[in-house]
From Swiss-Prot:
Keywords: Cell membrane, Membrane, Transmembrane, Transmembrane helix, Transport, Virulence. It comes from the Bacteria. This is Riboflavin transporter RibU. It comes from Listeria monocytogenes serovar 1/2a (strain ATCC BAA-679 / EGD-e). The gene is ribU. InterPro entries: ECF_trnsprt_substrate-spec, RibU. One of its GO terms (cellular component) is plasma membrane. It is found in: Cell membrane.
């Protein structure tokens, strides 16, 4: 963090706040699972990563979930849902950041978002199966006879795949318009990474 300037910290805080606002605008995606809601709060984290690096991704995801917990609380008393969203965001955004670092093209960005979607879906299936759903069942948030495997297969996995596709499509549209602006406003460290990788690709 010592390499982050005050300007970068302020920018990350703004992106985190924007992510929180977008998260508050969530809406159900699958009629069969109305408790699973889509939002576009990972897009500011993606932009933050491209501008300032992977630490910005973590901070934006953290800020939005801390703000959400402060404002909305949790029906079970502990921020389990916020933890799930934090993990989901990291497994989606960080793979995109790191893979795009090597591919550096429009096709590379499309592939990166596809990989991020698959990794996020897998991570959330595992987290829900072993942690989140058993926790909710234990606290009475779900019936004791809930078929966790069925819920994972027919709700959690389809939801996260659809979420990844929709969020990726919106981000790719934004990225096509913001690409030059992002390149102009990147930190020097991220710009050097980009230039170094461009030289490697050209050779």
């Amino acid at each position: 963090m010592k390499n982050y300037s005050m300007k970068v910290f302020v920018s990350v805080a703004v992106l985190g706040t924007l992510a929180f606002i977008l998260m508050m605008l969530q809406f159900p995606l699958l009629p069969s699972a109305p408790f699973l809601k889509l939002d576009f709060s990972d897009i500011p984290a993606l932009i933050g990563g491209l501008l300032f690096g992977p630490l910005a991704v973590i901070l934006v995801e953290l800020i939005k979930n801390v703000l959400l917990y402060i404002v909305s609380g949790s029906p079970v008393g502990v921020p389990v849902g916020e933890l799930a969203n934090f993990i989901s965001g990291l497994f989606y955004v960080l793979p995109i950041y790191y893979l795009f670092h090597w591919l550096r093209s429009t096709k590379g960005m499309v592939l990166s978002t596809a990989v991020g979607t698959v990794l996020m879906t897998g991570a959330m299936a595992v987290f829900n199966y072993f942690v989140l759903l058993p926790f909710y069942i234990k606290l009475g948030g779900l019936p004791a006879n809930t078929d966790v495997a069925w819920l994972i297969t027919y709700a959690i996995v389809p939801f996260n795949l659809l979420k990844g596709v929709i969020v990726s499509a919106v981000f790719l549209l934004l990225y096509s318009r913001l690409k030059k602006w992002i390149a102009k406003n990147q930190t020097m460290k991220e710009r050097r990474k980009f230039e170094k990788r461009q030289q490697e690709i050209s050779h």
